[in-house]
Amino acid sequence: MLARALLLCVALALGHAANPCCSNPCQNRGVCMSVGFDQYQCDCTRTGFYGENCSTPEFLTRIKLFLKPTPNTVHYILTHFKGVWNIVNSFPFLRNAVMKYVLVSRSHLIESPPTYNAQYGYKSWESFSNLSYYTRALPPVADGCPTPMGVKGKKELPDSKEIVEKFLLRRKFIPDPQGTNMMFAFFAQHFTHQFFKTDPKRGPAFTKGLGHGVDLSHIYGETLDRQHKLRLFKDGKMKYQIINGEVYPPTVKDTQVEMIYPPHIPEHLRFAVGQEVFGLVPGLMMYATIWLREHNRVCDVLKQEHPEWDDERLFQTSRLILIGETIKIVIEDYVQHLSGYHFKLKFDPELLFNQQFQYQNRIAAEFNTLYHWHPLLPDTFQIDDQEYNFQQFLYNNSILLEHGLTQFVESFSRQIAGRVAGGRNVPAAAQKIAKASIDQSREMKYQSLNEYRKRFRLTPYKSFEELTGEKEMAAELEALYGDIDAMELYPALLVEKPRPDAIFGETMVELGAPFSLKGLLGNPICSPDYWKPSTFGGEVGFKIINTASIQSLICNNVKGCPFTAFSVQDPQLSKAVTINASASHSGLDDVNPTVLLKERSTEL
């Protein structure tokens, strides 16, 4: 009887079909809802489409689709016709109109309030209210699907170590054709670690960055306790120390702030800053020092303007000003460089004041994943006339003191970074991080590359060759994954063919830009009630924000005002080496595979 009952249970289990939403039948951002065990419904509400699978466009949608150019066409227009864009840039009303279109068209791709997280693939109060989760652009692959990507591809995904070694690991350094430099690379790492703070104890779906945006917690600390330990409580300033006549962060001993340093690091080199991991490399501590100096400089400006203000108001207002400076630098210098546009991007919150726009943000897990730009890192770091490998560079603040900030800025402004797209450019020192990125994406059950392309209104790739733009890697990827609709998001972003003379491929830009711009303009200081001079201490503070740039940040805080930018100024440097990512493994053995990067987080 027991055996017969067990057989009956097995038969019933096998008789149940897979979740009908496993095949992602609902198109154009329609929401799939199972009905019973083998039926589904697509909710097409406000998608502009109708039909069983939300695949038939409404009349107005059909017109919009006919008139709307493809993302690659838009990119081509914005990166060519320089004379036309010079005219647009010189007329404020034209520049404002284009910038408004850029902001609205990008930010509307991000759902606000947030909808899903790793635990909930459907809308729930928990997924909205629990700030300890990263949100999700797409829900996780449904439970019980025939394959890891739903219904497409093989029953098991290929070994992540094999993916890294075959397609991601560097054979020979491939420089970025856009000329991106190490000032950019370390700015990216420093800036994003105020909101990419995966909780290693709870797993990749969780974050310790509860501010979910540009809150400068990497400068001031995530908690009030950490902030208070870092503050001087005089004139609004942060604690500091003077070394060789210059301002540097205080030590762990002086602040009792927890930082991550190996045991052998001497006390006087254990600098304490807002982010506990910023002792990892001197490039991060360089920016931490610059922003510390900037905060205290702004406090001096406000103190002169408002001698009646107490320490708390000077501190809080200076923080708001630095948030504004950060957003302006990110849009007008950082994103401007990445875009390659001849159109000049503009930070002007007033452009959105008559739009439906929510001044809140939630960091998405996919945004965190796509920001793993480890191919930017070179094999060695060149500072003045010295060269440091990873082993010499990690946890070595003595390099910062030995050379000083001026030499750091000058050297990193000259050193070119690596190309991110195109494959085979992750340095050996970061291969374990790349593997962990793939493993964690699988743990969080990300949908396929093509599902994310559809979510962000891109045409799905029809083949691996279309994805990579070449034949060798495409054939190997097809053998491992079996179907282009089963290709994973993270490795796809790194092997995708770059746009012409660009650092990224199409998917990285078209997914990353909406997350980025929504996060920046969704900041409370950009809202109508905040964006006014009185918020920032009057016209003096407002002017600091509105005139901020990466160059002014350096000039105000680094001795000698060294020239800087986010790209090398000699265009020949970026053209010096032409490398095919499908080349042989030559040069790989020259890299020491024992280099120790912190494995506690894939974000470093």
Swiss-Prot record:
PROSITE patterns: EGF_3 (PS50026), PEROXIDASE_3 (PS50292). The record marks S516 as: Aspirin-acetylated serine. Pathway: Lipid metabolism; prostaglandin biosynthesis. It is found in: Microsome membrane; Endoplasmic reticulum membrane; Nucleus inner membrane; Nucleus outer membrane. S-nitrosylation by NOS2 (iNOS) activates enzyme activity. S-nitrosylation may take place on different Cys residues in addition to Cys-526. Disulfide bonds join C21-C32, C22-C145, C26-C42, C44-C54, C555-C561. One of its GO terms (molecular function) is metal ion binding. It is a peripheral membrane protein. The modification S-nitrosocysteine is found at C526. Its cofactor is heme b. Residues 18-55 form the EGF-like domain. GO terms for cellular component: cytoplasm; endoplasmic reticulum membrane; neuron projection; nuclear inner membrane; nuclear outer membrane. It is an enzyme of class 1 (oxidoreductase). Glycans are attached at N53, N130, N396, N580. InterPro entries: EGF-like_dom, Haem_peroxidase_animal, Haem_peroxidase_sf, Haem_peroxidase_sf_animal, Oxylipin_biosynth_metab. The active site is at H193, Y371. Heme b binds at H374. It catalyses: (5Z,8Z,11Z,14Z)-eicosatetraenoate + AH2 + 2 O2 = prostaglandin H2 + A + H2O; (5Z,8Z,11Z,14Z)-eicosatetraenoate + 2 O2 = prostaglandin G2; prostaglandin G2 + AH2 = prostaglandin H2 + A + H2O; (5Z,8Z,11Z,14Z,17Z)-eicosapentaenoate + 2 O2 = prostaglandin G3. Residues 1-17 form the signal peptide. Binds 1 heme b (iron(II)-protoporphyrin IX) group per subunit. Keywords: Dioxygenase, Disulfide bond, Endoplasmic reticulum, Fatty acid biosynthesis, Fatty acid metabolism, Glycoprotein, Heme, Iron, Lipid biosynthesis, Lipid metabolism, Membrane, Metal-binding, Microsome, Nucleus, Oxidoreductase, Peroxidase, Prostaglandin biosynthesis, Prostaglandin metabolism, S-nitrosylation, Signal. The conversion of arachidonate to prostaglandin H2 is a 2 step reaction: a cyclooxygenase (COX) reaction which converts arachidonate to prostaglandin G2 (PGG2) and a peroxidase reaction in which PGG2 is reduced to prostaglandin H2 (PGH2). The cyclooxygenase reaction occurs in a hydrophobic channel in the core of the enzyme. The peroxidase reaction occurs at a heme-containing active site located near the protein surface. The nonsteroidal anti-inflammatory drugs (NSAIDs) binding site corresponds to the cyclooxygenase active site. Conversion of arachidonate to prostaglandin H2 is mediated by 2 different isozymes: the constitutive PTGS1 and the inducible PTGS2. PTGS1 is expressed constitutively and generally produces prostanoids acutely in response to hormonal stimuli to fine-tune physiological processes requiring instantaneous, continuous regulation (e.g. hemostasis). PTGS2 is inducible and typically produces prostanoids that mediate responses to physiological stresses such as infection and inflammation. Homodimer. Dual cyclooxygenase and peroxidase in the biosynthesis pathway of prostanoids, a class of C20 oxylipins mainly derived from arachidonate ((5Z,8Z,11Z,14Z)-eicosatetraenoate, AA, C20:4(n-6)), with a particular role in the inflammatory response. The cyclooxygenase activity oxygenates AA to the hydroperoxy endoperoxide prostaglandin G2 (PGG2), and the peroxidase activity reduces PGG2 to the hydroxy endoperoxide prostaglandin H2 (PGH2), the precursor of all 2-series prostaglandins and thromboxanes. This is Prostaglandin G/H synthase 2. It comes from Equus caballus.
